Regions:
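Hydrophobic transmembrane alpha-helices of multi-pass small-molecule transport proteins
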Residues: 25-47, 157, 166, 178-197
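Transmembrane alpha-helical segments that form core, pore/gating elements
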Residues: 13-15, 19, 49-111, 139
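Hydrophobic/aromatic residues within transmembrane alpha-helices
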Residues: 19-21, 25, 81, 89, ...
Length: 201
């Protein structure tokens, strides 16, 4: 369900950008967004759409929908950020997140649920800190600054596809034809969105 809900994030971003920033979107661009979402469906279902019938909404899905909505607000809000660099802004967010996590840390210590990572855990944490938490956020901020939230949001649908590609190299999973089809559809959807935008300009 996670990948399916995450696939709706570009739609959330476009809706919020339309309301907040008055960004225009036409039917061709909307069709491009739908194509990228269809590509996510292919990946989530492993090419078998009948498997989607077994999906059921649960509390985790509601939490994920809230997360996607809030991240969409964040993505659109980046266009209204102060005139400071991406690194300075990310540093500020990091300090806020650090302070916000302190009560949870004390709670885990108090309830004797604190688990310290071993060597493997430290390595994994290092990878998470450097790549998704730092570099990815910097690149996303720069992307929103350059091309806007609506266009940047479309690229988030590449996440499940690239996740599978990385799994092929690091987890020895098989690369299937539906991965290639999904990747092609996402780029086609982005092309439609971008091409129509250029013609309008």
């Amino acid at each position: 369900n996670l990948g399916l809900v995450q696939g709706t994030m570009p739609a959330f971003i476009i809706i919020i950008a339309r309301v907040w920033l008055k960004e225009q979107i036409n039917l061709i661009q909307l069709f491009g967004v739908l194509i990228t979402f269809f590509a996510v469906l292919i990946v989530v279902s492993s090419g078998d759409f009948y498997s989607l019938r077994d999906l059921q909404l649960n509390k985790g899905d509601v939490v994920m929908i809230c997360a996607c909505t809030l991240y969409a607000v964040y993505a659109v809000g980046l266009r209204k950020k102060p005139k400071i660099g991406a690194l300075a802004l990310l540093t500020f967010f990091s300090y806020v997140a650090f302070l916000g996590s302190i009560p949870g840390l004390f709670y885990e210590i108090y309830t004797d649920h604190l688990i310290l990572p071993g060597l493997k855990g430290i390595i994994i944490l290092g990878v998470i800190i450097i790549f998704p938490s730092f570099l990815a956020q910097i690149f996303f901020m720069k992307g929103v600054e350059k091309i806007g939230p609506a266009r940047s949001g479309l690229y988030t649908n590449l996440v499940p596809v690239f996740s599978f590609i990385l799994a092929v190299f690091f987890l020895n999973e098989l690369f299937q034809m539906y991965h290639l089809i999904s990747l092609a559809l996402i780029f086609f959807g982005i092309y439609l969105f971008e091409n129509k935008r250029q013609k309008v300009k």
